[in-house]
Amino acid sequence: MMPFLLQTQHLVHQFNNGTKALDGVNWEVTAGEFIVLSGSNGSGKTVLVRHFNGLLRPTSGQVLLNGISVHQQLQHARQTIGMVFQDAASQIVAQTVYDDVAFGPENLRLSMEEIDKRVKESLANVGLTNLENQHPYELSGGQQRRLAIAGVLAMKPQMIIFDEPFNGLDYEGVVQTLQQIVQLHQNGHTILVITHDLEKVLAHATRLCIMQQGDIRLDGLPEEVLSHVEKYSVKRPSPSQRLIETMTWLR
């Protein structure tokens, strides 16, 4: 059995108002997986993944990255676990596409040659090379999402988390984003996609997990989990007899 890339152990997160967002989550991620994580609004999905690279601190319990607590290796965790937020524009930090992607590597104090190499490779991977001098806010929603992916790729992560990556995108933007996610998995990245839109992506997943009330309630192969999702307020793609391999917007 492969060692776990990521583990949560009795993970609890309680907000200052007493609301418990995570309620003792025990969960594992193995390198190379493509996980779809779904659940109703407020079930704890985004709070959970923000613990994976130390953006949040647990109230109790811990997150282990390759067997070591995330909070003992924060810089390494933030390089290893990349995250593309639901609002891609919130990740824009610079005045040009090139400088935006360069921001992360610059903070690693890499050489200018290495930074330039990473930026150009990352922009090429997401198809934005010809836009490197453009202002990020002039990009379309789909292009901004690809820019956020490029910024993550420049950090050379092992795992990439996408939080509702299809929200607010038109058909072309969804297809471009999904193509990018699938390609990243094929290139060896571990992928976790938070989404309500199972019909857009489930065909590519190796695992489907459902959260409710701060814990993982269902976890397994997509074909084993799918028939139970509506018990946890997740819409099952219709018709009910639809094959999982058809649940993609790629053709």
For every predicted segment, state its role.
Residues 227-251:
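ABC ATPase nucleotide-binding domains
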Residues 135-139, 143:
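Conserved ABC ATPase signature
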Residues 195-196:
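H-loop/switch region of ABC-family ATPase nucleotide-binding domains
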Residues 38-40:
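The feature captures the beta-strand-to-loop junction immediately N-terminal to the Walker
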